[in-house]
Amino acid sequence: MSNANFSILVDFAAGGLVLASVLIVWRRDLRAIVRLLAWQGAALAAIPLLRGIRDNDRALIAVGIAVLALRALVLPWLLARAVGAEAAAQREATPLVNTASSLLITAGLTLTAFAITQPVVNLEPGVTINAVPAAFAVVLIALFVMTTRLHAVSQAAGFLMLDNGIAATAFLLTAGVPLIVELGASLDVLFAVIVIGVLTGRLRRIFGDADLDKLRELRD
């Protein structure tokens, strides 16, 4: 693979990560959010896969395949099951920040990410380093989602976005994350999603809803 093609494809993957994050902020349908997470996982997996193919590095290719399986298939499937079990609430409740304001804040966070990471890009410009601002933007957007969404599944989606952004930053800044490290991190995330799914199910059975704002009202 030529450097020109590699650069274009990495930019597409990084752009896909940010686009999926912005669409998750925009959407309120929980099923759509899960599908977008799956697409974001595929965009994340493309980064080590492309690097492995270009460098003929089988370990990186294996990491990319593992990321694709876990982030684009297994974890979204677990979240989809949690959403499917809640037939009465397929949409996110009114968030703390409305959609228009959320999109404006997301744009601001993206610009902030590019400003913060610009010194890193200038220090050692390169094909993958140039895409680091996009990965860091995903981290900031994920933190915003986690603090403004009220549904347990939406907050779990924000947590997965955060992990995707951190993993993308690691893939872009280094020569690649060793397979055992990536598997360990992914298994931690998998465990967290399983726990969130179990807790969401129990909240739904006991209180009839998994909306955290409504649960606070019950407590009060």
UniProtKB/Swiss-Prot annotation:
Mode of membrane association: Multi-pass membrane protein
Note: Was identified as a high-confidence drug target.
Keyword Transmembrane: yes
Keyword terms, alphabetized: Cell membrane, Membrane, Transmembrane, Transmembrane helix
Protein name as catalogued: Uncharacterized protein Rv0085
One GO cellular component term noted in the UniProt record for this chain: plasma membrane
Compartment(s) where it occurs, according to its Swiss-Prot or TrEMBL record: Cell membrane
Top-rank taxon, per record: Bacteria
Organism from which the protein derives: Mycobacterium tuberculosis (strain ATCC 25618 / H37Rv)
Coiled-coil portions: none
Glycoprotein is among the record's keywords: no
Transmembrane spans: 6-26, 33-53, 59-79, 103-123, 126-146, 157-177, 179-199
Disulphide linkage map: none
